[in-house]
Design a protein with these regions (language model features):
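Nuclease catalytic cores that cleave nucleic-acid phosphodiester bonds
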Residues: 1-107
Length: 107
């Protein structure tokens, strides 16, 4: 298991990285060129700025069993379809039981 963070605009990057380090869980950050991170011990993947470019980069590295932190309902749905878990930065889990309703109401 690894934790992948959709880091563009994610309010809990540093906290998540700290928890991953404490439990020896690999943590990967995905961002675009407008939000570049440099955190020791964390692998950072940088996508070009563009519609959903960070999401596609994250998906290309996703493995079954990974945990993804994202505020993006669409990305969460794609992660669930690939046998990964997805969590909102506030802590609630996206599941097959709630993702359709969330996708319906997204802006």
């Amino acid at each position: 298991m690894r934790v992948l963070i959709d880091a563009d605009g994610c309010p809990v990057v540093r906290e998540t990285v700290r928890q991953c380090a404490a439990f020896h869980v690999p943590c990967l950050l995905f961002c675009d060129t407008a939000h570049v991170f440099s955190i020791p011990g964390v692998e950072v993947f940088v996508a070009d700025c563009g519609h959903d470019s960070t999401d596609y980069l994250l998906l290309s590295h996703l493995r079954p069993g990974d945990v993804v932190i994202t505020q993006d309902y669409g990305l969460a749905a794609l992660c669930l379809a690939r046998s990964a878990q997805a969590l909102h930065p506030a802590g609630h889990a996206y599941t097959k039981d709630n993702i359709d309703a969330l996708l319906t109401v997204r802006a």
